């Protein structure tokens, strides 16, 4: 970030704080609160703090744009591949899965992929929690968003950010008989740097209230292509253009206590294999990271990267639909051959 721009933002933030303090001492608390709660002011304050441009549109217009609607041909979830039975994985399924290592660990992938998964996700109480650490992440073409090659799409509007993607996953899972809690808390606003800490508290709250939860999905989208531009992914679901999916598993490499990280990796391998069986090329390599990203809270935790900033929302929704179908296929667990 350019130091001159950072200094200008800091100066503006100090000026706004001084004016706000002066107004507060003048006894106009309610008008000031209303002013600071305006979407355009919230967006500006986020820019001052992080340098990120966020769409100020937070209230739904009278008529929602067509892009917010899931593709009509995908409105009914496809039946899971093995309904009401455990899936069986073999060593040959490992050929469908790639792993991108950012750590020195080299676990036995065949053993993890073919290991039993003993659970039943179809219960009377919720068994899956969906959260969004970077809730304001959005996609190309969202209304009123400002885009630059070195920037990132962000939106406070739940019809365009990660909440919309989480809603599609939850909708398909619920239709398949799985009870879901979709927490729509915005964890990356106003403080982006506190995002994972905010999400951790949210997850802990739900696990305490619903100890039967055995899968926590932190749904994101990817951003950079590694050379300064916005990444665009390319996959297909039932012959239709879709965003690609990437599952991220954490480890204890960064020094945090996380003894069960291989269980989460095993789940990522299983889901990726199922996705590739149904729609070859839909997934990117499973990524093994050094940080735990709150995955230590339950063995069924994953980060799900649905497409990237350069993809369209409707492509992300189609990929989310396919991901939910793969979860449905694992609803009754997995057995060894």
Predicted regions and their residues:
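A short, glycine/acidic-enriched catalytic loop
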Residues: 148-152, 224-260
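Structural recognition of the beta-strand scaffold that forms the well-ordered cores
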Residues: 129-131, 180-182, 215-218, 246-249, ...
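Active-site-adjacent mobile loop/cap segments within catalytic or ligand-binding domains
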Residues: 281-337
């Amino acid at each position: 970030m350019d130091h001159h721009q950072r200094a200008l933002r800091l100066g503006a933030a100090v000026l706004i704080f001084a004016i706000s303090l002066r107004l507060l001492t003048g006894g106009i608390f309610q008008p000031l609160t209303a002013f600071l709660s305006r979407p355009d002011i919230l967006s500006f304050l986020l820019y001052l703090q992080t340098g990120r441009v966020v769409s100020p549109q937070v209230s739904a217009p009278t008529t929602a744009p067509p892009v917010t609607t899931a593709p009509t041909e995908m409105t009914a979830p496809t039946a899971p591949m093995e309904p009401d039975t455990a899936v069986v994985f073999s060593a040959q399924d490992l050929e469908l899965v790639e792993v991108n290592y950012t750590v020195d660990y080299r676990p036995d992938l065949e053993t993890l992929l073919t290991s039993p998964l003993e659970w039943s996700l179809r219960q009377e109480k919720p068994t899956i929690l969906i959260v969004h650490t970077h809730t304001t992440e959005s996609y190309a073409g969202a209304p009123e968003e400002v885009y630059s090659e070195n920037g990132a799409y962000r939106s406070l509007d739940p019809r365009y950010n990660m909440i919309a993607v989480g809603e599609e996953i939850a909708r398909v899972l619920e239709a398949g008989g799985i009870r879901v809690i979709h927490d729509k808390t915005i964890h990356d606003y106003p403080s982006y740097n506190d995002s994972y800490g905010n999400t951790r508290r949210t997850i802990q709250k739900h696990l305490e209230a619903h100890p039967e939860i055995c899968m926590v999905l932190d749904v994101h989208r990817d951003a950079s292509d590694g050379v300064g531009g916005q990444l665009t992914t390319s996959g297909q679901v039932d012959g239709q253009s879709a965003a690609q999916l990437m599952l991220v598993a954490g480890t204890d490499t960064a020094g945090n206590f996380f003894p069960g990280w291989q269980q989460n990796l095993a789940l990522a391998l299983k889901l990726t294999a199922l996705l590739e069986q149904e729609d070859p090329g839909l997934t990117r390599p499973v990524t093994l990271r050094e940080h735990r990203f709150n995955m230590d809270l339950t063995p069924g935790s994953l980060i799900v990267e649905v497409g990237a900033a350069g993809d369209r929302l409707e492509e992300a929704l189609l990929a989310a639909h396919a991901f939910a179908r793969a979860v449905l296929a694992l609803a009754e667990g997995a057995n060894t051959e």
